[in-house]
Amino acid sequence: MQTTILRRFGTPEIRRWQQADMTVHSERRVIPHRPEDLYALVADVRRYPEFLPWCLAARIRQADEHALSADLIIGFRMFRERFTSYVELNPDQLEIEVKYAEGPFKYLTNSWRFLPHEDGCEIDFHVDFEFNSRLLQSVIETLFTDAVRRMVQAFETRANALYGRAPERISADQARPQVTAPQG
């Protein structure tokens, strides 16, 4: 099942379709926060259990400035699964790529891109995965759109809590570097 949501401070446009046995979601959303702040929030995997629905625990195995490997335990109703992923961090481009290492999936990848926008930050988020278990895959497919929407909303709510509700609109002058001629 594939879901695409395009949203800018309003009701999202949602498109869903089946793509083999993989579950896919893509979303672009404008959030009134700085791209650097949102990048830092998503890169801070260790804190996911504090605010992310169904994330019960997070353990960082290894980390440096540009990558980390982490174990996450996710749980929903009677399901509880642990998986490991590698997270590639690109702070210069404000991009995060997540690759699956081990756990209950056949395949898992997701990406985040944080782009400057006149209203704050445009987030480009993509995830696709397939579980090894057909039972787990069928359960997730019925709940998938709502689950991903809640997860993305949890990041936005966390950003509001950490960085303030919604900063004032960023003007074009604030977004551009200011250059002044030397006084002579």
Label the model's feature ranges:
Residues 43, 109, 138-139:
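Generic recognition of short, well-ordered alpha-helical segments
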Residues 2-66, 119, 165, 179-184:
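Hydrophobic ligand-binding cavity/cleft-lining segments
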Residues 36, 112, 153:
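Short alpha-helical basic/polar micro-motif
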Residues 49-53, 57-66, 73-124, 128-130, ...:
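Hydrophobic-ligand binding "helix-grip"
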Residues 131, 135-179, 183:
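A conserved amphipathic terminal alpha-helix motif
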Residues 44, 101-103, 141:
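Short beta->alpha junction loops/turns
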